[in-house]
Amino acid sequence: MDNCIFCKIVKGDIPSKKVYEDDLVMAFHDVAPAAPVHVLVIPKEHVLESARAVAAEHAALIGHIYTVIAKLADELGLEGGYRVVTNAGPDAGQTVMHLHFHLLGGKLGPMA
């Protein structure tokens, strides 16, 4: 999608502090972190707009994303635990309509 900020990051049009990339997903540090470690993990293709749109055909992609999240948590020193958050729709706080997962670790603030 031309106006999607995450699609622009994947294409390299917008810089990011990338921590992981493969054929399916990309992970990078959030520009406004809500925790000491705050990484976004996104599918590289804009095929899903939110968690509400996830269908059975996307099960392998979602499984891959969670595998990447676990790998990143280990690499980023989150042995003490971490949170994985996805917001589904504007009322839940989703501001970028491209499926993404927040990996949050370290001392966390409020859940809001």
What spans do the regions from the language model cover?
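HIT superfamily nucleotide-processing domains
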Residues: M1-A112
